[in-house]
């Protein structure tokens, strides 16, 4: 992955690293990422997880451990047991994976830490978190992963248990800010009905796919559709995806990753970008569609195209197209206000409704919207844009229960500072602040947004709906 971040490159050069250390300057670590469509080894390795040596722990009866043992075996992930959880060795062996005891004195460098905190029923029992991570953090390898599993607080049996489960959020967000060398941490609340639906989430978070996601909280609920048979090599094979705004930047990256994972991608963009979007579609073996999504006949044009390329219906719909018209509110014209709201959130709502009414969206369809940190934290000069992106989040939350009745899911990603042509044109001081004001000390890449969308669009992600996942390196802005 190329980057225009000169400081990142300098700080990791032979001379730059010495100078940064001498002056006490930050040294952001180049993040490990998956190969993209058409890159060397993409077909061989983009679909298979690099097995990260994982240390496993848990509190109480740790009800997720049996499922975790099976999933880690399926993913080919080797594991070690923390001293307080030696029963893990037998569980791993029973699942078909060799395991042993973690001993930090042996100099082992685990790539991941997993802790099942879902049985913690009081704040006193949170001490088990301290013990596990106090013993293991110093041994972590670079670009490591930390996953804490909990029980959704509203499902806890007692007020004391609910209180303790809610504490996990503050713990994980703080821990993510303490991690170094490109490591990340997440909290995954798992409802009892979702315990057998961890596959796509583990596949994502234990791999380089989740390079720029950290400090996030996701909830796996009662799945809205059944998990199909496991197929990690090209999991989207035989499926059709529509990506709007696909001619360049984040949209092109989304189309590229979905194509890498096997989807036929319909690349949609405005007529003036016809040449660019056609080039993207041709490269990916997809199909281009020139269409202004805000036009009154946009849904009809899209349905007509899908009737030809995907007569069985649409599996994945990604609302990526969007615009900015930045002005302070006092200087903003009504046209600048209205165009941003209409394209960024009005058009996606109309497309959703029209495709549902026409029966174009298949059962098990996944819809993903692209929101923004601006929609969460707000941003000066972006009242229109922030309102539209907050509305995307509202759209996801409002549509989730309605789509669940049809066995479909809807989620959103909220990117932070992503290295694109647009951010490259931002003034230097603002650009540098955007890059450094997160726990990973660097901007993200379009592929980071794309990989997160591919996780939410995975056929085995039926337990994820109504979720908003930030792709921001744990930005200091927003909640």
List PLM regions with ranges:
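Glycine-rich nucleotide cofactor-binding loops and adjacent beta-alpha elements
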Residues: 1-235, 412
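Conserved glycine-rich Rossmann-like NAD(P)H-binding loop of the short-chain dehydrogenase/reductase
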Residues: 76-90, 263-278
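Residue(s) in the substrate-gating loop at a strand-loop-helix junction
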Residues: 372
């Amino acid at each position: 992955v190329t980057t225009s971040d000169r400081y990142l490159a300098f700080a990791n050069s032979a001379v730059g690293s010495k100078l940064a250390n001498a002056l006490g300057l930050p040294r952001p670590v180049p993040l490990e990422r998956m190969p993209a469509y058409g890159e060397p080894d993409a077909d061989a390795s983009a679909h298979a997880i690099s097995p990260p040596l994982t240390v496993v722990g848990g509190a109480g009866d740790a009800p997720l451990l049996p499922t975790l043992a099976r999933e880690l075996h399926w993913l080919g992930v080797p594991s070690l047991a923390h001293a307080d959880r030696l029963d893990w060795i037998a569980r791993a062996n029973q699942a078909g994976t060799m395991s042993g005891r973690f001993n930090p004195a042996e100099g082992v460098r685990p790539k991941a830490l997993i802790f099942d905190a879902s049985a913690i029923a009081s704040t006193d029992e949170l001490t088990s978190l301290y013990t596990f991570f106090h013993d293991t953090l110093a041994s972590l390898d670079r670009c490591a992963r930390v996953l804490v599993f909990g029980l959704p607080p509203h499902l806890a049996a007692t007020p004391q248990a609910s209180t303790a489960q809610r504490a996990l959020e503050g713990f994980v967000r703080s821990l993510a800010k303490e991690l170094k060398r490109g490591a990340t941490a997440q909290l995954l609340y798992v409802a009892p009905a979702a315990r057998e639906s961890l596959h796509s989430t583990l596949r994502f978070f234990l791999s380089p796919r989740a390079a720029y996601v950290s400090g996030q909280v996701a909830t796996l609920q009662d799945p809205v559709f059944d998990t199909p048979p496991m197929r990690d090599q090209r999991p989207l094979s035989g499926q059709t995806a529509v990506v709007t705004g696909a001619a360049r930047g984040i949209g092109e990256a989304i189309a590229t990753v979905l194509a890498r994972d096997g989807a036929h991608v319909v690349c949609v963009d405005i007529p003036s970008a016809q040449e660019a979007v056609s080039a993207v579609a041709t490269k990916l073996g997809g199909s281009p569609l020139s269409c202004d999504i805000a036009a009154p006949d946009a849904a009809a044009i899209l349905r007509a195209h899908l009737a030809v390329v995907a007569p069985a219906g649409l599996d994945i719909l990604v609302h990526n197209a969007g615009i900015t018209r930045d002005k302070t509110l006092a200087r903003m014209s009504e046209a600048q206000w209205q165009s941003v709201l209409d394209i960024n959130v009005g058009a996606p709502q109309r497309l959703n409704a029209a495709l549902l009414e026409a029966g174009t969206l298949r059962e098990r369809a996944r819809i993903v919207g692209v929101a923004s940190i601006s929609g969460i934290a707000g941003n000066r000069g972006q009242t229109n844009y922030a309102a539209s992106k907050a509305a995307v989040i509202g759209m996801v939350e409002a549509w989730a229960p309605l789509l669940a009745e049809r066995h479909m899911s809807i989620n959103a990603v909220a990117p932070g500072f992503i290295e694109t042509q647009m951010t490259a044109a931002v003034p230097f001081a603002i650009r540098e602040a955007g890059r450094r004001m997160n726990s990973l000390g660097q901007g993200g890449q379009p592929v980071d947004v794309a990989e997160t969308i591919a996780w939410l669009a995975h056929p085995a992600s039926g337990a994820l709906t109504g979720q908003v996942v930030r792709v921001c390196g744990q930005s200091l802005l927003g909640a």
